[in-house]
Amino acid sequence: MKRRLAAFAIAACLFAPVAQDNDTLEAKVRAYVPVVSLVKVCDIRINEAASGDHRAMLEAVKSDPNANKLAYRLHYETQTAYIKARDGGQRVAFCKDFIAANSQYAKARFTAVVEGHLSDVSTSVQKAIAHNVCGAPPAKLSRADWKPYAQIKKMLQSEQKSAKENAETNGWNVTEETTAVTEQFCAAVKTR
């Protein structure tokens, strides 16, 4: 009896690292597949660290049939939930909640773009944009700051126009879509 228990203990020790690797892979599949599944429809930009991890996870999934099935099922469930929300008129709320819940992996694409542009302008431009678009306290602009201010403002207007056209084309709520763009913009401004 002791011999059998010893053999079982040895076998369990041999398979423990494999089980641990499978658990790690499963956790990564559960984390990344829904995010990547909604990149296009929710207009998400994945951060660099998550993008690298996702590529590594995809390579590992190719050799593990159980992980592959899980990835497929999660993608299907995520897309189904999105379609249900979209068809129920809740697309923006669904995407907003999803991005908030997965903020460690991704953010709204427009928020990421605005953050990139804001890092190149002065703080007075950032404060003026925050005041005029997001309701922050007033700020003064120097003559040199008007051009970058106008460029960022034009970028916002262009994104809002695009959101409006997409909403009209797809039969979505125009006000909700353009408001979401403004909220994404203000989220980037507030992180500064």
Where are these regions (language model features)?
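Positively charged n-region of N-terminal signal peptides that target proteins for export
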Residues: 1-4
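Hydrophobic helical h-region of N-terminal Sec-dependent signal peptides
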Residues: 6-15
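Secretory pathway export signals and precursors
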Residues: 9, 38, 89-91, 129-130, ...
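Immediate post-signal-peptide N-terminus of mature secreted/exported proteins
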Residues: 20-52, 112, 117-139
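Compact alpha-helical subdomains of small soluble proteins
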Residues: 50-121, 135-192
